[in-house]
């Protein structure tokens, strides 16, 4: 697979995919909305604090790679960004909803077990059980390959999977940065839902402000 994304490029692409699925009425994203999505404290590993300048530089590089496009008109005051990572008319990468849900989570949170992926993708797609997640992961590992099964960590019941859109996985660096927690608690799930609702409201306000500016202009 020729495509290689840097860590911040993976974060931006993951955020654009996530918002396209979860909040389609606010997609494509403005730069401000994209910054908020990249810095979101829920469903992100690691949590980052990126500036508009940081994100603009990443977006410019992704536009150069033809993985992101500005859908706003040439004279528009506010650019709006849409990914062209997959499922485009002439693109090579075509994924089902389940495949895309898994890839999106891996881009946003790094290596995860099938159980974690089933729990965390419920806002992106649906799986009947972990066996179905295993089957989709096996398919993604055969094609491309797009994901890889990592060696099982000591004391863990399940192996984690990582995406390969950023090249081969550095196992030593991964082991040193391995997260201590596994499944999210119900309280964490509620917090995630609230944070996503806040981000959605922020995006709606931003969209209203842009439309008001256009009417006044």
Curated annotation (Swiss-Prot):
Pfam families for the chain: DUF480
Cross-referenced InterPro entries: DUF480, WH-like_DNA-bd_sf, WH_DNA-bd_sf
Family: Belongs to the UPF0502 family.
Name used for this protein in its record: UPF0502 protein AHA_2872
Biological source species: Aeromonas hydrophila subsp. hydrophila (strain ATCC 7966 / DSM 30187 / BCRC 13018 / CCUG 14551 / JCM 1027 / KCTC 2358 / NCIMB 9240 / NCTC 8049)
């Amino acid at each position: 697979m020729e495509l290689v994304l840097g860590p911040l490029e993976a974060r931006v692409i993951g955020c654009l995919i996530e918002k396209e699925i979860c909040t389609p009425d606010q997609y494509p994203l403005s730069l401000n909305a994209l910054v908020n999505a990249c810095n979101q404290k829920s469903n992100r590993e690691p949590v980052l604090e990126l500036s508009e300048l940081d994100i603009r530089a990443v977006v410019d590089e992704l536009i150069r790679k033809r993985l992101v496009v500005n859908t706003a008109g040439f004279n528009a005051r506010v650019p709006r960004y849409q990914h062209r990572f997959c499922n485009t008319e002439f693109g090579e990468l075509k994924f089902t909803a389940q495949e895309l849900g898994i890839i999106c989570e891996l881009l946003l949170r790094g290596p995860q077990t099938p159980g974690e992926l089933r729990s965390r993708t419920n806002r992106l797609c649906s799986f009947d059980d972990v066996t179905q997640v295993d089957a989709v992961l096996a398919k993604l590992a055969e094609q491309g390959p797009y994901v890889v099964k990592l060696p099982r960590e000591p004391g863990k019941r399940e192996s984690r999977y990582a995406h390969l859109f950023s090249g081969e996985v550095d196992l030593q660096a991964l082991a040193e940065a391995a997260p201590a927690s596994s499944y999210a608690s119900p309280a964490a799930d509620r917090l995630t839902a609230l944070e996503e609702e806040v981000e959605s409201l922020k995006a709606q306000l931003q969209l209203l402000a842009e439309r008001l500016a256009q009417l006044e202009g």
